[in-house]
């Protein structure tokens, strides 16, 4: 089953990113909470109209963002 075929997100890639987040974490529970918290923030941003890209579900977007932050820390500001 493809999670979001119409949005252009590969479900296999999303699953690998999620597994990578869990595997590289020291605490699986805190990683899950971070994903959920980020998804909740994105959901409210969608309601407020702050994000243009609403075809991706908030949980999917948060997994992608956290995975990118983990794999490419040099992209973070500061």
Swiss-Prot record:
> In the record, what terms sit under GO molecular function?
DNA binding; DNA-directed RNA polymerase activity
TM stretches of this protein = none
**Gene Ontology CC, one term:** DNA-directed RNA polymerase complex
Q: Which domain of life is it from?
A: Bacteria
Recorded catalytic activity of this chain's protein: RNA(n) + a ribonucleoside 5'-triphosphate = RNA(n+1) + diphosphate
One annotated GO biological process: DNA-templated transcription
Q: What is its EC number?
A: 2.7.7.6
- Provide the alphabetized UniProt keywords: DNA-directed RNA polymerase, Nucleotidyltransferase, Transcription, Transferase
Identify its protein family.
Belongs to the RNA polymerase subunit omega family.
- Function summary: Promotes RNA polymerase assembly. Latches the N- and C-terminal regions of the beta' subunit thereby facilitating its interaction with the beta and alpha subunits.
Question: Subunit info?
Answer: In cyanobacteria the RNAP catalytic core is composed of 2 alpha, 1 beta, 1 beta', 1 gamma and 1 omega subunit. When a sigma factor is associated with the core the holoenzyme is formed, which can initiate transcription.
Write the protein's name.
DNA-directed RNA polymerase subunit omega
